């Protein structure tokens, strides 16, 4: 057993949240931090993680991806579905789609309506979104100008399909918005991305950790697979991990900060003796504290691709040809420009499928090529697609460890599509998307519907297609939810402190009480910025006074 020094804080997981905490906590020179990461470095010369257009590559291997699989999903034809999670400095920000989407203001106001979470309103959170961000066109009431995370906006001269798809959404009666992270999320518009001015992925390893690495009070250990958190009674006092299969440990004077993400954090807690007592006893794990909510309340976003042939030769299909890729790669490598410098998700939208929803329940990503998210099944002809998925499914899943062995993946079950609302939303999503594709703005482009195919019309046909073809949007969350101690399923309080224990916080997407309306990287970074101030004992940033849109019963769409 190799024992490392004592540190003030030990952070488990160098991902979207952990790197923020490591950077902010070490701004205090008298505070020592140990940052543990199961994966390796974020190699800056590896185009797979650094080139935005190469976003599919990290999902295809296991160097940067945990490549979890779910248990057979009972409402999805018993498919074992992908559950990719980032591994390496940067975590999932190293392999995500780089969509900079914060969620809807109402998501956070909804959190704040829950007991114990009163200071999580949108106006409490907005200053921390701004603190994290440097947006390439400058700051305003909603955006930051000097944060570690670089955000790039779509520029004139990008693929003409983006503007056509936004215009088609507006022609179908839905709002137009100039900023999906600004005053009004609802509507169709340009989509920002976490990409540097030189066309590189802006992960939290590049943005945050590069600031902190030179500091003598930060120690980073990669290839450190966390085994368990060590306790003295009810107090977390250290961490044990495996490096080259050899156990090592260190002690924490102040706190252990668990930032493993929505899949890893619950399993680390359960292996450490914190979780549902019956599960832990069945695996002969010594019980430290019974917390039934650990690994419960698991949520995600599910999405479909609707693919169409493109009648004009303007899609990115030629970029998929091997003989075109050296030139694309060279332009990106030497100039930081061109197709390689974009994730190609430069437009999208959020709409309500029905007036029953107070804020958008469907998200769109537009892509000027037809291909699966992980790079499989590319369509060789000119083609394009819309990704559409529901945002706040009432379905709930769970995560259970299978053994004490940290190398064994957990049992993951999302229970996708287990609620009738899920089916209503996906039927509506496919029909609305077809209406958008039929608008005049897309008439010069839209050809044959490749997938699902125009023969698919009835509810039963659509349902069968969803069961067989819907895929994760890679947004697992909520598996250690925040809430008041009176809520038996809450795992942490509004400051990330684990109920019933001392010296242990969780800071990652697992503590969301309900998944947000959009992608998870930006909200997770915001949460870490906010809780970093709490951990450091700093006065919270002043609440924003910026106005924000509420539908307040407005029609879902304009009717001619």
From Swiss-Prot:
Keyword ATP-binding: no
First-level EC class: oxidoreductase
GO molecular function, one term: betaine-aldehyde dehydrogenase (NAD+) activity
Catalyses which reaction(s): choline + A = betaine aldehyde + AH2; betaine aldehyde + NAD(+) + H2O = glycine betaine + NADH + 2 H(+)
Keyword set includes NAD: yes
Obligatory cofactor(s): FAD
Residues involved in FAD binding: 8-37
GO terms of biological process kind: glycine betaine biosynthetic process from choline
Pathway the protein takes part in: Amine and polyamine biosynthesis; betaine biosynthesis via choline pathway; betaine aldehyde from choline (cytochrome c reductase route): step 1/1
EC number assigned by the record: 1.1.99.1, 1.2.1.8
Transmembrane segments: none
UniProtKB keywords: FAD, Flavoprotein, NAD, Oxidoreductase
Catalytic machinery residues: 475
Pfam families, A to Z: GMC_oxred_C, GMC_oxred_N
Role summary: Involved in the biosynthesis of the osmoprotectant glycine betaine. Catalyzes the oxidation of choline to betaine aldehyde and betaine aldehyde to glycine betaine at the same rate.
Protein name: Oxygen-dependent choline dehydrogenase
Native organism: Stenotrophomonas maltophilia (strain K279a)
């Amino acid at each position: 057993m190799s024992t490392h020094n004592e540190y003030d804080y030990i952070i488990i997981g160098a991902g979207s949240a952990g790197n923020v905490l490591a950077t902010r906590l070490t701004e205090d020179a008298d505070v020592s931090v140990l940052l543990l990461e199961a994966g390796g470095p974020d190699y800056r010369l590896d185009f797979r993680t650094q080139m935005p257009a190469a976003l599919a590559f990290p999902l295809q291997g296991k160097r940067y991806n945990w490549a979890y699989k779910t248990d057979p999903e009972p409402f999805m034809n018993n498919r074992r579905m992908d559950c990719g999670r980032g591994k390496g400095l940067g975590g999932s920000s190293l392999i995500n789609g780089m969509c900079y989407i914060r969620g809807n203001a109402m998501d956070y106001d909804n959190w704040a309506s829950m007991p114990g979470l009163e200071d999580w309103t949108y106006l409490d959170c907005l200053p921390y979104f701004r603190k994290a961000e440097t947006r390439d066109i400058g700051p305003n009431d909603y955006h930051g100008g000097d944060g570690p995370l670089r955000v790039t906006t779509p520029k004139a001269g990008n693929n003409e399909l983006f503007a056509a798809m936004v215009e088609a959404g507006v022609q179908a009666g839905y709002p137009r918005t100039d900023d999906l992270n600004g005053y009004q999320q609802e509507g169709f518009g340009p989509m920002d991305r976490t990409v540097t001015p030189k066309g590189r992925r802006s992960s939290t390893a590049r943005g945050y950790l590069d600031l902190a690495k030179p500091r003598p009070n930060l120690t980073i250990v990669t290839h450190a697979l966390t085994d368990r958190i060590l306790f003295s009674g009810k107090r977390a006092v250290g961490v044990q991990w495996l490096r080259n299969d050899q156990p090592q440990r260190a002690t924490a004077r102040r706190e252990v900060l668990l930032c493993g993400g929505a899949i890893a954090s619950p399993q680390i807690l359960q292996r450490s003796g914190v979780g549902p007592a019956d599960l832990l006893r069945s695996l002969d794990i010594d019980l430290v504290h019974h917390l039934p909510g650990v690994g419960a309340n698991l949520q995600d976003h599910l999405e479909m691709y609707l693919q169409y042939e493109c009648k004009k030769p303007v899609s990115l299909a030629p970029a998929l040809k091997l003989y075109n890729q050296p030139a694309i790669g060279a332009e990106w490598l030497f100039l930081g420009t061109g197709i390689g410098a974009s994730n190609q998700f430069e437009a999208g939208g959020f709409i309500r499928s029905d007036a029953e929803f107070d804020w958008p329940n469907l998200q769109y990503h537009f892509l000027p090529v037809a291909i699966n998210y992980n790079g499989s099944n590319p369509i060789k002809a000119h083609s394009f697609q819309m990704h559409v998925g529901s945002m706040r499914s009432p379905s709930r899943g769970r995560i259970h460890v299978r053994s004490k062995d940290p190398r064994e993946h957990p049992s993951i079950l999302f229970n996708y599509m287990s609620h009738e609302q899920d089916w209503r939303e996906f039927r509506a999503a496919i029909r609305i998307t077809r209406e958008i594709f039929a608008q005049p703005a897309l008439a010069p482009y839209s050809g044959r519907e490749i997938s699902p195919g125009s023969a698919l019309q009835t509810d039963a046909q659509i349902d069968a297609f969803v069961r067989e073809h819907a895929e994760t949007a890679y947004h697992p969350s909520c598996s250690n939810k925040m809430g008041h101690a009176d809520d038996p399923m809450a795992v942490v309080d509004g400051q990330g402190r684990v109920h019933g224990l001392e010296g242990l916080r969780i800071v990652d997407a697992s503590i969301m009480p309900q998944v947000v309306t959009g992608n998870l990287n930006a909200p997770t970074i915001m949460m870490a910025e906010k809780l970093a101030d709490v951990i450091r004992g700093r006065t919270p940033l002043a609440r924003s006074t910026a106005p924000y849109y509420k539908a307040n019963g407005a029609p879902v769409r304009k009717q001619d």
